């Protein structure tokens, strides 16, 4: 006999019974559920079976699907579709026109996540961010990382040593000689200004490697850029090599992670060519948006 399913909406906080279904990054919702969030829980025979959470984006007419989870034994029974449909209905009632979601998966399009989302009416997910990760021991094994050096007329300096004049010149170049997604000053309060590097050539800044603590032992290679006139001469990989050697010598971080926006096609190709090792893990943050 099929279990009767009840769907409940929650405000204030998620019930502790749903803790096993809450993703790690949303654990705070068990204590306080933000007022701009909608949470639906599916219950059967007194047990939590599924959970869906969406977050409205401020004054925008869009929302992010933050979680849609169904317990393993209850999958493929329509619970996920039911939660998704009810969540979308509530969002429409609140004037929301778009719902977007993203998930981390393999570099291949066919996946359970993609199939489920498409069955719920979402377009086929597209790459949003390419992600590479591994240990610094792997970087030590890559021949070019160890051997490649910058010529003498190039100078690598800590990002925090940029002069006021250089900072102004870089800021002026945003949208001109480098795209906004490679802005080295974006979320500057989060970056490691001591380990992040700037590349100077004949008294002009022509590139940077921005680093950010990602975890206690993991360092994020957040943004790498070299001016187009210097890209064909291998200065980008040389800058990456210099940053890696410094961090390996220091020994504080064990692992690294590299994010590259899918729009940055040149950098994606660069990483695929240069950071190639059987123990380097490659994933993609897939994104899709549905009109309500």
Over which residues does each language-model region extend?
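A conserved beta-strand-loop-helix scaffold within acyl/acetyltransferase catalytic domains
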Residues: 23-39, 43-44, 49-62, 66-68, ...
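Hydrophobic, helix-prone linear segments
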Residues: 1-59, 266-280, 284-287
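Conserved active-site alpha-helix within GNAT-family acetyltransferase domains
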Residues: 81, 93-97, 105-127, 262-281
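Conserved GNAT acetyl-CoA-binding A-motif
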Residues: 91-106, 247-260
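C-terminal structured domain segments across diverse proteins
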Residues: 231-292
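Short amphipathic alpha-helix that is part of the acyltransferase structural core
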Residues: 1-35, 143-181
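Conserved acetyl-CoA-binding loop-helix of GNAT-fold acetyltransferases
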Residues: 70, 76-93, 226, 232-245, ...
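C-terminal "cap" of GNAT-fold acetyltransferases
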Residues: 129-162, 274-292
